[in-house]
Amino acid sequence: MKILVVNAGSSSLKYQLLDMKDESVIAKGNCDRIGIDGHVSAKTGDGRHIEEDCNFPTHTEAFEKLVEVLTSGETKVIDSMSEISAVGHRIVQGAEVFKETCLVTDEVIDQIDALAELAPVHNHPHALALRACKAVIPAGTPQVVVFDTAFHSTMPRKAYLYGLPYECYTDLHVRKYGFHGTSHRFVSGELARVCLLYTSDAAD
């Protein structure tokens, strides 16, 4: 099973293609400086590598380049995007709308785009990348969005409200959301695993 992982930033589009039977990296790269003087860097798991300047007016063109480097030329690793079993996208801001990972639909993309007021540098590029991916991935291929804010969604109100007029929260949605939740989830999971191993060893 091959999984494509995408991280669309404000002016970049990073990706990794993983072989999930051993979680090895088949290919990875970055379309950088989107909207300026674009540049692509791509590398395969067996060491093939390209660096070239490209024109990326938007994340849509960057995603088209991503497809090109995966399916053709010196960095070709698949014959077509149909070889990809699923796609995962990292999304910065889920606000109070998205509290867990979910499948991508047109409605989900629209909601992510609408939350750009809370993450203006990130959420609109996320939506562009999602739409571009949806256009080139065969219909029926599951796409999943993972939100940085989801890990922190159980914060109590007394922790996430600021000492500001309450209307700042009710009208403008100004509150603490928490970020880098995917990293926090991984670290906390690893900590629990290591502590469990340690306590098991101590018991023996």
Labelled PLM ranges:
Residues 112-123, 170-181:
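Flexible, glycine/proline-enriched loop segments at strand-loop-helix junctions
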Residues 12-56:
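Short glycine-rich, Thr/Ser-proximal phosphate-binding strand/loop in the N-terminal lobe
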Residues 37-85, 129:
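Conserved active-site "lid/cap" helical segment
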Residues 124-136, 180-197:
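Conserved phosphate-binding catalytic cores of ATP/NTP-utilizing and phosphoryl-transfer enzymes
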Residues 198-204:
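Conserved small/polar residues in nucleotide/adenosyl-binding loops
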Residues 6-11, 34, 200:
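A short acidic Gly-Thr/Ser loop motif
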Residues 1-3:
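Extreme N-terminal starter segment of soluble prokaryotic enzymes
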Residues 70, 76-122, 142-144, 151-159:
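Short beta-strand-loop/turn "lid" adjacent to the catalytic site in phosphate-handling enzymes
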